[in-house]
Structure formats: C-alpha cells, structure tokens
C-alpha cells in the first residue's frame, strides 16, 4: 500500500513498489521506477528514466533531472538538485542546509557525476559536471574541477 498526495503527476511507464509515501505536488517523468519504502516529500520533480531503488528519502523542493540512479538508502535534503546522469551509490547523503527557508537549490550535483557509496556531501555544496567521489568520501567544499575525489575530507586524486 502506498500513500500518494494531491496533484501527483507521472509519465507513462511509471512503476512504483510498496509502502511508499509521496507528498503533494510531486511530478515524475516517463520510465521512472520507485522501489519499496521510499519517502518523497512535497514539491519534488523527477525527470525521465530515473531509478530510485528503495529506502530512499527525498526532501521537499528537490529536483532530479533525467537518467539518474539512486541506490538503496540515499537521502537528499531540501532543495537538492541532481543534474542529468547522476549515480548516487548506496547510503549516500546530502547533508541539510541552514534553518532559513530557501527557494533556490542548495546542494547541486552536476551532470555525469558518480557519488560512491556511503559518501556525504555537506550542506549547500556544489559539484561541477563529471566528478567522481570514492566510497565513504566527505565533500566539505565546492568542487569546481572535474576529476576523481576521495577521502575525508575529499582531495583530488586525479
């Protein structure tokens, strides 16, 4: 059984598992798969060809563009933006912002990024396109140059 809020919109080929909670004004594109036990809060937009595996929480105001994959246990905090073709490994987290309500996106993950499993991205950090983080990395600053980043805190590997 799922709980789906008001004004929910989905494209064709939308699939949803069991025991999900979807808030009001959520828009989901074509060929989207939402696994089991996901929580999607109000005013979230999800593009086409997106997979949310399961046990995922997406906070209000978040936008996920096309061709993204979020593995089990991913948590996206308020107003996060995932650009096209982002992969979030299992149990990755974007950490929350400030107490102030913002209308612009806080944490931004650029196109073609791969976030390794268990990684954390600090509040309101921005990753440019084509960034890879190793598993269990902690992103505590903006990343403005494409490359591979690892460690706590992250440092550029190459």
Regions flagged by a language model, labelled:
Residues 125-127, 142-145:
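C-terminal substrate-recognition "lid" of short-chain dehydrogenase/reductases
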Residues 141, 158:
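Short helix N-cap motif at coil->helix boundaries in the Bergerat
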Residues 144-145, 150-153:
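Acidic, glycine-centered active-site loop in nucleotide-sugar glycosyltransferases
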Residues 1-9, 15-127, 152-157:
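Flexible, glycine/small-residue-enriched loop-and-beta-strand segment within the central core
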